A protein has these predicted regions:
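Membrane-helix interface segments
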Residues: 2, 33-34, 73-77, 118-122, ...
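Hydrophobic core segments of transmembrane alpha-helices in multi-pass, intramembrane catalytic enzymes
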Residues: 44-48, 125-128, 179-187
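Structural signal for membrane-spanning alpha-helices in multi-pass inner-membrane proteins
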Residues: 52-57, 87, 91, 95, ...
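Hydrophobic alpha-helical transmembrane segments
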Residues: 5-7, 38-39, 77-82, 123-127, ...
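Functionally important transmembrane alpha-helices
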Residues: 18-21, 156-169, 174-219
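Juxtamembrane helix-loop-helix connectors linking adjacent transmembrane helices
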Residues: 27-38, 62-133
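Function-critical hydrophobic alpha-helical transmembrane segments in multi-pass membrane proteins
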Residues: 88-91, 111-171
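N-terminal, membrane-interfacial amphipathic/helix-forming hydrophobic leader that caps
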Residues: 1-76, 209-219
Length: 219
């Protein structure tokens, strides 16, 4: 029942109430789509984290440790960096194949970043992509959704379903969906390997940081 509530928040309430209504208002005030997007990310982070706390932690008297926030060992950190490097290599391969097929990986997000290459804009983009998003997305998609589906359909079933959900929420940036799916699988695998979503958060943050950096460096 609680998972159903989360699905309603993720796929209905948040897209309609936050992204559709508040984004336009924020864009009008800030006058910059990058800043408005990061602000929306922060608002969604607070909402999603609160919903997870309300429906999962408080309701069942759990702790944040129960959804995967546990200390990492040096070995866990090593696995994290190996996973990030592997994900980057595979993602580059996927993007090269897409380019050969005539599918551009440029989208509204990359265009927004490339339109303003100031240090200030870079820092704002990094905060949104490499700080805010990894924290709340890993809590929700790996800490809650992956754990829920893993307990019912096994490790690979949990990875597949949670990664599909993670991919769907990145629509309408359709040309990056293959990479979104791959990253979802890798982050879920890391969580399973290290028994901590902190590893997934770090990997997610590093991957997004590199993506933002490369976007700023591109012509």
């Amino acid at each position: 029942k609680e998972i159903l509530y989360l699905f309603v928040f993720v796929f209905l309430i948040v897209p309609v109430m936050i992204e559709s209504l508040f984004y336009d208002y924020a864009l009008k005030i800030l006058g910059n789509s990058l800043y408005a997007g990061v602000l929306m990310g922060l608002i969604m982070a607070v909402i999603f984290t609160f919903v997870v706390y309300l429906f999962c932690i408080k309701r069942y008297k759990l702790s944040w440790k129960d959804i995967g926030i546990r200390k990492l060992s040096w070995k866990d950190l090593l696995w994290t960096f190996v996973a990030v490097i592997s994900l980057i290599v595979v993602s580059i391969g996927v993007l090269m194949i897409m380019e050969k097929l005539g599918i551009s990986f440029e989208n509204s997000k990359t265009e927004t970043i490339q339109n303003d290459k100031s240090i200030y804009a870079f820092c704002i983009a990094v905060i949104g992509a490499a700080v805010i998003s990894p924290i709340y997305e890993e809590i929700l998609y790996r800490g809650v959704f992956y754990t829920f589906f893993r307990d019912r359909y096994g490790i690979w079933g949990g990875m597949l379903i949670s990664s599909i959900i993670f991919t769907i929420v990145h629509i309408p940036t359709y040309n990056t969906l293959p990479v979104n799916f791959l990253s979802g699988v890798v982050f879920a695998w890391l969580y399973e390997k290290t028994n901590s979503i902190l590893s997934a958060m770090i990997a997610h943050a590093l991957f997004n940081f590199i993506a933002v950096l490369l976007t700023f460096m591109s012509n």
